[in-house]
């Protein structure tokens, strides 16, 4: 073969065994190599190294590209090349001619002393030259996975070996954290980071289907895996306790009965405001099965419909509550200012609101009757609501010329307005329940939306001022016979028939000629205008005086609720007529008005400013508190509305998908993610405030003035009336400047505390429920020392210390206990169940956090008590005999057994108020240690024996401080509830529970305060008197006594673990008592707002830009870099990438 042919084929042969000049390599890359080079040039540089192979001694040399597999095979000789068919005929002939050539007999062998840098052995065959060393072909392997990398490798500095080591492509990209978590291949271009993993864009899919998440799609995480909306909703999403829909975004977590319940935010607000769940238990069991049977589009449509329904319910009813509550507030404010005429205009607007609600209830009732379903129980509540409003009109007519500062009149007004809010709330709940029952039981989908649309008509009611010209009711309604039946002349307070201005009972319809009467139907009745009589259809047509061409007037049906509205209008017109006749009401000056009221209400025209008199008017105080609350919430609402656009643009959250959702809490919580972006060179910033999230702000319970706020403010006003001195220097709980921890005033000299100079207007009010365990122990100790001088005739100091569990046992007492069994004291203690279990165990095992009562701290009470009181608050507590009657004894036994087995097994809403009250008494009666404890029974009885009322109050107050924390928190919640129940004792002459504070104390005392001994001395009357004082002044007894509170404010008390002896505490207490007077102090009832737990909506962005430089950039920088950017975390965790210089590995033969 000629030299020319050899160059042509890229082959070089030698006959003397000495290798000539190495052949020139002519690389011919394959198509696959071309594609790889093109892709890597654009996205990521990597070295593609070629190998030069030299034949063994006496053979031919071949220079071409080698793969890692080919490098393991021996080079072919001439015969093998000829037989392989790779050469054409000319090349085969050339090989034959070369075979005929004569080789020298003596062949010169070259000895080699090359050493492999990896194994240290002598290289006698093929070898690789790379990284400045030579290796056996089989020894040149990846440092991480030990695979052959002679064909292509990536050098990297190894800090442990202090030299460069070769890596394969996979391990190199693994060290750079640039491997796809799905396919395991290198990431050379755009990628997505999610769940702390990286994915190719086309590989970021659902774990159960092939849904690819685009830049603006949402994904859901569960147990480290990614799911689409459909599979997460049907398989793993937590269910809402209200609607049983999947929880995919924000939610509220409620800990109840030892179980954590998850709620949608609007579902929880609907349940909290009206105690209504949107889904029944029967449908909850099959909801997941139904969801799995739906397609993705059907599931999306169903969820969208559910979301719209929930929002429609909340929006319509919450706004209706706000309108009605504001109207009630305006009405009472006008009455307090003496603006009686304007108050009538305000009442006219309130009647229109009621008319809208009654119209919606009638529409639901009509649909229920078409399905022959059970009617809604709305009659009693609607009747009591109208009676209270009529009573307000009667009271205004009675006292419009008299002094309205009379305490009895003030209390009557407060009770009536409390009843208005209470019964209006019940009617909203009843109507909502009826609409949901039609939808779920009878598949009537249009009933509830129709009712909500009717309620939304309240926004069209005139919202302007209360000018006297706005009164548009006909004055002829003031006639004496306008509210009577036309036939029987009796009161018409039920459904009736109407023809023009004639109204009569359906049962009173009777033909004056033939005496026909049908009490079930009224279609036959006609009105004869000539005779002014009611006739049947036959008598009416047979009459010669009636022309056939004339229309035949027939009666129309008037529902019961429509008749109630008609009666309210009559009462209002009569009041308006009285006020017009006595023109004094429109000219009299308003009672002393606070100038601050001018800017309080935007809907009420305040009276002219007058000087504030020294004597405080009760209505003016109430109006200040109520309108401060309205102003606070309305300003918050206006601020949120005006800043909605700004917040939607500024409240942005930028992060990559790699950001972990650590705020979401538990693994079972839904992790909802969204990533967005476009192929630009920068990170994408996506707004986190989507329309749904902005709409979530509407579910803030503190943004609107509701019917629940009215009883709270009225309760505060009553407390102010009973104890004005306690509230003289205390701000209202609606004052934003009010804080729990206001500092006490100390007189210091050279850093040493000389004494305390308390000021009544600045002294903080502490509550027993807010104290820490150390402060409670200190309070008990000091209370015993203060209590001893007051009861020294009855108990010694040691006996008081033993009552409060503060006395440490002596030697003989401990010696005697050593002989007792370990379970001697606890052998009869029941630990499982609900009834008969000690209160401390119930609180520790399944407590409910309650904010009812005074103070801002959370009170830990048994879950049963929390559920029972919450259910009773939503009931009608004006039922006669509540807490006095024993209820159904058999049902009580069934309920107690069910609660012992499973606390969640009963539905409190299905029980009557009397049954729930009896169940609560049974629970208290069966406590092993009563609520007020056996040990302190004597102190409570002793307090009732003291002659001085001031001493009785002090002894009771200090005795309360000695109660265990669980007993005291439970007592505070129960007594606060009983105080509220007593407000329903007398609503009017016919309605009321007749259970005032004394009657409640009489029936509850045998269950909470009794002696352990069988002493024949009957002390039940003394116990009742003690409990009566506790209920009547429960807010005062929830405070820390003033002298103890000042001690707790001492900064040196707990400084450096200061240890006080009893004598030091007693001496310190005497110093404080000598400096201050013990006047009565109290605080307004303050209810802490319930915080809503939000699940953070994770907003992430996809970095779709290629962070990998091109090949030319690598040539300039001689480095490889791959960075991941996280806009949400400025301090990125990106690690420095190793410097890589492209090199060629040369494979030779030794």
Swiss-Prot record:
It is found in: Cell tip; Nucleus. Residues 40-62, 598-617, 1104-1134 have a biased composition (Polar residues). Residues 1088-1097 have a biased composition (Basic residues). CDD domains: LIM1_Lrg1p_like (cd09391), LIM2_Lrg1p_like (cd09392), RhoGAP_fLRG1 (cd04397). The keyword Nucleotide-binding does not apply. GO terms for biological process: actin cytoskeleton organization; regulation of actin cytoskeleton organization; regulation of cell wall organization or biogenesis; signal transduction. Residues 114-177, 178-238, 483-546 form the LIM zinc-binding domain. InterPro entries: Rho_GTPase_activation_prot, RhoGAP_dom, Znf_LIM. Residues 1-78, 586-683, 726-759, 1078-1097, 1104-1150 are annotated as: Disordered. SUPFAM superfamilies: Glucocorticoid receptor-like (DNA-binding domain), GTPase activation domain, GAP. The record marks 884 as: Arginine finger. One of its GO terms (cellular component) is cytosol. It holds the Pfam family LIM. GTPase-activating protein for Rho1. Involved in the F-actin patch localization, cell morphogenesis, regulation of septation, and cell wall synthesis. PANTHER family: RHO GTPASE ACTIVATING PROTEIN 18,19-RELATED, RHO GTPASE-ACTIVATING PROTEIN CONUNDRUM. This is Rho-type GTPase-activating protein 1. It comes from Schizosaccharomyces pombe (strain 972 / ATCC 24843). The gene is rga1.
């Amino acid at each position: 073969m000629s030299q020319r042919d050899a160059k042509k084929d890229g082959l070089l042969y030698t006959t003397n065994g000495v290798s000539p000049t190495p052949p020139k390599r002519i690389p011919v890359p394959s198509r696959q190599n071309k594609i790889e080079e093109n892709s890597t040039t654009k996205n990521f540089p990597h070295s593609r190294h070629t190998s030069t192979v030299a034949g063994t001694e006496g053979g031919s040399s071949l220079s071409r590209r080698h793969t890692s597999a080919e490098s393991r095979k021996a080079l072919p000789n001439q015969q093998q090349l000829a037989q392989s068919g790779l050469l054409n005929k000319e090349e085969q002939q050339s090989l034959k001619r070369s075979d005929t050539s004569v080789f020298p007999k003596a062949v010169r062998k070259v000895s080699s002393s090359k050493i492999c840098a990896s194994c240290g052995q002598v290289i006698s065959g093929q070898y690789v030259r790379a990284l400045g060393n030579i290796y056996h072909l089989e020894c040149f392997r990846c440092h991480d996975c030990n695979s052959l990398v002679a064909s292509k490798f990536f050098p990297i500095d190894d800090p442990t070996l202090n030299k460069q080591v070769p890596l394969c492509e996979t391990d190199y990209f693994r060290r750079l954290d640039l491997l796809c978590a799905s396919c395991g291949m290198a990431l050379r271009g755009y990628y997505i980071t999610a769940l702390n993993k990286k994915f190719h864009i086309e590989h970021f899919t659902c774990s159960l289907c092939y849904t690819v998440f685009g830049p603006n799609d949402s994904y859901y995480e569960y147990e480290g895996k990614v799911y689409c909306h459909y599979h997460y909703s049907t398989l793993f999403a937590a269910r809402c306790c209200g609607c049983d829909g999947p929880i995919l975004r924000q939610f509220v977590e409620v800990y109840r009965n030892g179980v954590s319940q998850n709620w949608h935010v609007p579902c929880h607000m609907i349940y909290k405001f009206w105690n209504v769940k949107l889904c029944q238990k029967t449908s909850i069991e099959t909801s997941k099965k139904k969801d799995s049977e739906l397609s993705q589009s059907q599931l999306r449509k169903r969820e969208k419909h559910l979301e719209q329904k929930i929002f429609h319910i909340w929006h319509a009813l919450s706004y209706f509550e706000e309108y009605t509550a504001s109207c009630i507030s305006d009405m009472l404010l006008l009455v307090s200012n003496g603006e009686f005429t304007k108050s009538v205009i305000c009442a006219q607007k309130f009647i229109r609101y009621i008319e809208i609600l009654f119209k919606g209830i009638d529409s639901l009732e009509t649909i229920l009757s078409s399905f022959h379903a059970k009617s809604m129980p709305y009659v009693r509540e609607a009747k009591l609501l109208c009676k209270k409003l009529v009573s307000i009109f009667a009271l205004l007519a009675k006292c419009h010329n008299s002094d309205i500062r009379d305490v009895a009149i003030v209390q009557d007004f407060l009770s009536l307005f409390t009843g208005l809010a209470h019964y209006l709330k019940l009617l909203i709940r009843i109507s909502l329940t009826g609409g949901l029952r039609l939808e779920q039981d009878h598949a009537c989908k249009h009933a509830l939306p129709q009712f909500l649309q009717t309620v939304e008509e309240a926004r069209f009611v005139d919202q302007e001022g209360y000018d006297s010209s706005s009164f548009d009711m006909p004055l002829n309604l003031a006639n004496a016979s306008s509210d009577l039946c036309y036939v029987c002349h009796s009161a018409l307070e039920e459904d009736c028939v109407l023809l023009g201005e004639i109204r009569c009972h359906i049962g009173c319809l009777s033909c004056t000629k033939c005496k026909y009467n049908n009490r079930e139907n009224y279609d036959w009745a006609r009105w004869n205008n000539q005779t002014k009589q009611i006739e049947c259809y036959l008598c009416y047509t047979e009459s010669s005086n009636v022309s056939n061409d004339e229309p035949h007037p027939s009666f129309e049906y008037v529902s019961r609720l429509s008749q109630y509205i008609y009666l309210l209008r009559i009462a209002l017109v009569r009041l308006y007529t009285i006020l017009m006749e006595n023109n004094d009401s429109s000219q009299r000056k308003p009672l002393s008005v606070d100038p601050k009221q001018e800017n309080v209400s935007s809907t009420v025209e305040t009276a002219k400013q007058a000087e504030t008199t020294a004597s405080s008017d009760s209505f003016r105080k109430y109006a200040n508190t109520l309108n401060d609350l309205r102003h606070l919430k309305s300003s918050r609402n206006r601020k949120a509305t005006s800043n909605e656009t700004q917040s939607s643009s500024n409240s942005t959250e930028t992060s990559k998908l790699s950001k972990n959702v650590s705020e979401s809490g538990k693994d079972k919580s839904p992790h909802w993610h969204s990533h967005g972006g476009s192929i630009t060179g920068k990170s994408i910033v996506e707004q986190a405030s989507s329309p749904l999230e902005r709409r979530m702000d509407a579910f803030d319970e503190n943004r609107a003035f509701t019917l629940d706020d009215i009883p709270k403010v009225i309760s505060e006003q009553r407390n102010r009336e009973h104890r004005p001195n306690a509230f003289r220097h205390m701000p209202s709980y609606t004052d934003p400047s009010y804080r729990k921890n206001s500092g006490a005033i100390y007189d210091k000299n050279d850093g040493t505390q000389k004494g305390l100079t308390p000021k009544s207007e600045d002294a903080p009010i502490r509550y027993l429920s807010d104290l820490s365990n150390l402060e409670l122990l200190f309070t008990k100790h000091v209370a015993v020392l203060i209590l001893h001088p007051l009861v020294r005739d009855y108990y010694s100091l040691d006996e008081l210390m033993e009552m409060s569990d503060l006395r440490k046992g002596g030697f003989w007492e401990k010696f005697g206990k050593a002989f007792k069994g370990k379970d001697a004291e606890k052998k009869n203690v029941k630990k499982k169940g609900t009834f008969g279990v000690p209160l401390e165990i119930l609180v520790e095992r399944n407590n409910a956090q309650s904010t009812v009562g005074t103070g801002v701290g959370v009170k830990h009470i048994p879950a049963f008590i929390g559920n029972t009181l919450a259910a009773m608050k939503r009931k009608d507590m004006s039922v006669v005999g509540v807490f006095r009657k024993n209820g159904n004894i058999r049902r009580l036994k069934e309920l107690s057994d069910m609660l012992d087995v499973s606390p969640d097994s009963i539905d409190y809403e299905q029980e009557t108020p009397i049954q729930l009250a009896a169940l609560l008494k049974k629970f208290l009666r069966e406590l092993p240690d009563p609520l007020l404890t056996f040990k302190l029974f004597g102190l409570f009885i002793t307090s009732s024996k003291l002659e001085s009322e001031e001493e009785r109050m002090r002894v009771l107050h200090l005795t309360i401080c000695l109660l265990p924390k669980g007993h005291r928190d439970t007592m505070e919640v129960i007594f606060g509830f009983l105080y509220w129940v007593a407000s329903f004792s007398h609503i009017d002459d016919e309605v009321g529970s007749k259970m005032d504070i004394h009657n409640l104390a009489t029936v509850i005392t045998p269950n909470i305060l009794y002696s352990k001994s069988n002493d024949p001395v009957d002390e039940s009357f003394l116990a009742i008197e003690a409990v009566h004082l506790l209920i009547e002044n429960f807010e005062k007894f929830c405070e820390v006594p003033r002298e103890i509170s000042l001690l707790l404010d001492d900064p040196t008390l707990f400084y450096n673990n200061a240890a006080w002896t009893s004598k030091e505490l007693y001496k310190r207490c005497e110093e404080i008592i000598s400096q201050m007077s013990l006047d009565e102090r109290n605080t307004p009832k303050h209810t802490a707002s319930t915080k809503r737990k939000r699940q953070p909506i994770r907003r992430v962005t996809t970095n779709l830009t290629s962070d990998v430089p091109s090949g030319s950039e690598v040539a300039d920088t001689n480095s490889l870099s791959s960075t991941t950017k996280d806009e949400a975390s400025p301090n990125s965790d990106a690690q420095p990438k190793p410097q890589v210089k492209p090199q060629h590995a040369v494979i030779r033969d030794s």
